Amino acid sequence: MSALAKNYNRRKISFKNGKGSFLYSTNGKKYLDFIQGIAVNSLGHANPHLIKAINKQSKKLWHVSNAFIIPEGEKLAQRLAKKTFADFIIFQNSGAEATEAAIKAARRYFYSIGQPKKNRILCVKDSFHGRTLATIYASGSKKMTEGFGPKVDGFDHFEFGNHKSLKK
């Protein structure tokens, strides 16, 4: 019996390794990894450039608090800001943490311009944003929120593809 929490209905497939966009099961079958580890493996499996960067950094520092200056973090933030719309970067540990940061940033923005009551966020019903309290309520999924009351308020939901419902 597995000691892992039963938060997924696991398939009876076990993977031993991956290469690029493909996964290889323990019985030797090749699969296209269209899920990409729930969208976290965008560079593919066993990416040689990523392996090299991880190995190089692991020999220096693993992590220190963001209360300190980390030269490699500064360098990466500069590169990302230069190639995107962003003026500054905040690194997050997960998609849920990034979503929480986006919720807070949106609410703080309207608070800072004197519109604190403008705090509701539109979300696609039955979407997935993570497993924190705020992100499960952002999902609009009864299955995900059942038993986790009281409700985290501030989210309005619309059906995916139903543009008319956005006018409400």
Label each residue range with its predicted role.
Residues 15, 46, 72, 158-161:
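Short secondary-structure boundary/capping elements
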